[in-house]
Design a protein with these regions (language model features):
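Glycine-rich flexible loops
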Residues: 1-157
Length: 157
């Protein structure tokens, strides 16, 4: 079948697309999900302890992103894709790590610098990009600024 790369996630804290459970529960796109047509059935609920509450497997990068959510407490949304930003002003990590490689956690954390940020956008060397924000509005602003047509966090009814 078709392979779909990249993923999206959100910290469940009363905003889309979660129902408020606890502050330590997250939604991740399921593995091999077409992100163009993502809906509620394509999301996998995962606890901060890495317990998965679905028959579907979450993204390979789930463990990496869970640790990034711990490192960056203000961050509530992340999108990771397998393309790159051409803008020279965007930082690029120095080392290549494949999907799900735990070494990428420190690489991203060090590249961002401060853990008290409300957003960050990085190119991941030979891997793609990651965008992380505190609010849906800030995510949409960054997506619009860089002319990305990624809208996985639309309202689900």
């Amino acid at each position: 079948g078709m392979r779909y790369f990249g993923n999206c996630s959100t910290r469940c804290a009363g905003m889309f697309p979660s129902k408020r459970l606890e502050n330590d529960v997250f939604l991740f796109s399921a593995r091999n999900t077409n992100k163009i047509f993502i809906d509620e059935s394509d999301l996998v609920l995962v606890s901060k302890e890495r317990t998965c509450f679905s028959k579907k497997k979450p993204s390979v990068d789930t463990v990496v992103q869970l640790e990034l959510y711990k490192n960056f407490e203000k961050i509530n949304y992340m999108i990771h894709g397998h393309a790159f930003f051409k803008d020279e002003g965007i930082k690029t990590t120095t080392e290549y790590f494949p999907c799900g490689d735990l070494r990428e956690i420190n690489e991203i954390t060090n590249a961002v610098g401060s853990r008290n940020v409300e957003w960050f956008l990085l190119n991941l060397k030979n891997h793609g990009f990651i965008i992380a924000t505190d609010t849906l509005e800030n995510m949409e602003k960054l997506l619009d600024l860089y002319k990305l047509e990624i809208k996985p966090f639309r309202q689900i009814k």
